[in-house]
Amino acid sequence: MKRVITILGAVSAAAALLASCGGNSPATAVDSTGHKCYSGIYPHLAYYNSQGECGTGAVVPWQNDLWVITYSPHMPFGSDDKLYQITPDLTETARPESIGGTPANRMIHLPSNQLFIGPYAIDADKNVRVLEWEKVPGRHTGMAAHLTDPENRILLATMEAGFYDIDVHTLEAVELYKDGNQKRKEGFKGELCTLFPGYHGKGFYSGQGVAVFSNNGEESELAQRQFDIPSGCLAEWDGKDWKVVRRNQFTEITGPGGIYGNPNPGTDPIWALGWDYRSVILAIREAGKGWSYYRLPKASFAYDGAHGWNTEWPRIRNVGNEGETELLMTMHGMFWHFPETFTTANSAGIRPRGAYLKVIGDFTNWNGRLVFGCDDSAQSEFLNKRKQKGRIGGPGQSNSNLWFGTPETPDNVGPVTAAGSVWLRDNVKAGEPSDAFLFNGWDNRCAWVANRSANDTEITFEIDKAGNGQWSEFRKVSVPAGSSLFVPFEPTDDAVWIRAVSSADIVSDLTFVLAEQETRDTEPDPMFKGIATLKENADSKGFMYGLPNQRRALGILASTADGEQYYELDGEMNMRAKTDDETADYIRDKFAIPHGVVEVDEGSVLIVDAKGRRWRLPLGADGYAEKIAGDEVRICREVATERDLLSLCGTFYELPAENADGYAKVRPVCSHNYVINDYASYRGMMMFTGIDHSAAKGNPHIVFSEDGKAAVWAGAIDDLWKMGKPTGHGGPLVDTEVKAGVPSDPFLIGFYDRRDMYLSHSGSGSVTFKVEVDPSGDGQWFTYGEYEVAAGQTVEHRFPRAFQARWIRVTTSEDTKATALFEYR
């Protein structure tokens, strides 16, 4: 495609300079660009602002350079955020024309040969013009081809439903609808968005005679606490009137033309990405047909939240090399392959590629490398507070960075295990099919179906084998009143989409859980060599804090053989001892590891969340309970904006904010035998303290202080997938006094590989153990099986590969002392 060539330019000597960081020599982090690089992150490219968040709004190659904009969380009238120009030798310049704000819009306007990015228009000679905030106030979120004069004009949308008609030559703007922030500035007391439901705008695109806009939030106090209320909107405008298309949270809107706009706007489809508390929603608008909908599973639930703040900007974007089309989609923590030919008649080809932990606002292919613009370190932490973090706060100054990878990076991150529902506490009508749910792309698949009604039903699963809209009967299952059922699928069951039909009116839950075969083992990647283990004491430890007030360094209060010493790590990764008692005292006070915020017993780690809910996580290697009790290891910290990283008993977990359902949706990432004293994000990197200096020699990921007495590990958060597959053991009951019919606490079982269960009791007669699962963490329990356990007997059960669920619990038929243990190998 010519348009791909226009944006990428020729791949020349610049491509050689931008070789992978994997080309580092064994003892240095300097790569072939001459810059230090840690797992694809160049510290010198990091950007800062003075607000509570510094996210990446857009990254676009233009005239051989990479153009990047950052945003503050709510600055509709400008800020100190910048437009950055990065040359192929990785020289970064903050353009003097920068006016900041909260921008994430970008479009290449081919007729005028300009890049529009944020409030800037950049011509073929790299001259930058500015759309002043006085003329176009608001948080710029999207641009779309003009409905009647696409050669000379462009449409701009703001997050608070402001819309402008802009002359691409003069940049004169006609206000179509006033931005909500501007209305409030002028004295308006109502909601920010009044044109349609929801607020917190995201996507904007045009075609088929309409402009389509999305928002993904709700402006209410309840939306800041409860994730499953009505929220968001997909709407379209015909040039005169607005029409609500669907009342759900939506983000990206695009089409085959991507950043350029559709080449055949009258007939090309429009795609939109959204979600609700059930699953991801994929919408498509086709000429002459209107809107159709499909559902996909969520790899991560950390993006949920009715306020819409946790998503940033998911995208569908061409990342193919010159002359190629390869669409990459990001949504709810998953990289997806998206087919450029996607229509309702040809819907095959969506495929999960890999799960990730970074928070990504935009991405592109630049000279053969994928570049992800991230939202890494937010000073405010917003609503993401919890007891297990203690008094720790965010960094002193918000900062983020770019993450460079290869075209294969999306395939080489985390496993694509995911879950989603088509029905969740829903009133289901007899004979009415559910939405289509993606079925192909995973090795191990199952469904959990529940009939919460007083009448029996038969559920018919139907499949669309080829993605052509032709449905056929696949399987029937009977679900009596008040019962639930585990429905495993075989790896050979082949279809693009699956849906369900009930024979009776019922209240039902139907959740699919899908997983690929685990290919990782328990051995960590050599990049982690030198982090202290349970068998080796650390030569240096320390607490870390990103410094405020434009110091742009990482403060480290280190513990060494010589005692306590304060260090600073700068943007060139030089670590020097400093005398700064004020900062050292601040770190000592605010960043101490909290005591007693979790309970480790002989079977599990017990966590009680902010809502009083009880959760149990597996144990790891012997020795971690002592480390936790002694406050030697950080338990919980935000290292990617608006979600936490939990570290317990040798396992790292992704932990959504409480407003995204928190511990209910926790996800294990990796297991290990390391004793990591502290972890933090800095300039886009993942940082660890707790280093065995002798073992660390020669590892380019280890940064030593100039005096050689302290050290830290530096990499990327998605390196954690290489630390070792999740393992663990334990259970919710260990010779525990139980009452008949009272369920145990939930115990995590999701995301592990080989899983075994052991049931026993101390009673003199037989006891029946009822085993239930919550497949997605949504609080709906399904019966997996009932096991009669004789006195003195231990019943062992290995879960089949098709079995997938997040939580498990057991209930006994008698009062007794019961044991329910699990081994995850």
Residue ranges and their predicted role:
Residues A29-G52, M527-N537:
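A short helix->beta-strand "capping" segment at the edge of beta-propeller domains
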Residues L45-D81, G100-M107, R445, N537-T560:
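Beta-strand-rich domains and repeat architectures in extracellular enzymes and scaffolds
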Residues Q51-A58, S98-S112, K135-N152, N181-Q208, ...:
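Repeated scaffold domains used in trafficking and secretory/extracellular systems
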Residues W67-G100, G118-E132, I166-D167, Y177, ...:
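Beta-propeller domains
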Residues D81-P88, L171, Q224-K240, L282-G288, ...:
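Beta-propeller blade signature
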Residues I270-A272, V280, L296-T343, F437-N440, ...:
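Loop/turn-rich, solvent-exposed surfaces of beta-rich toroidal or solenoidal domains
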Residues K358, D362-R425, D678-E737, L748:
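Blade-level signature of beta-propeller repeat domains, shared across WD40, Kelch, NHL, RCC1
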Residues P491-S508, P800-T816:
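Noncatalytic modules at the cell exterior or secretory-pathway interfaces
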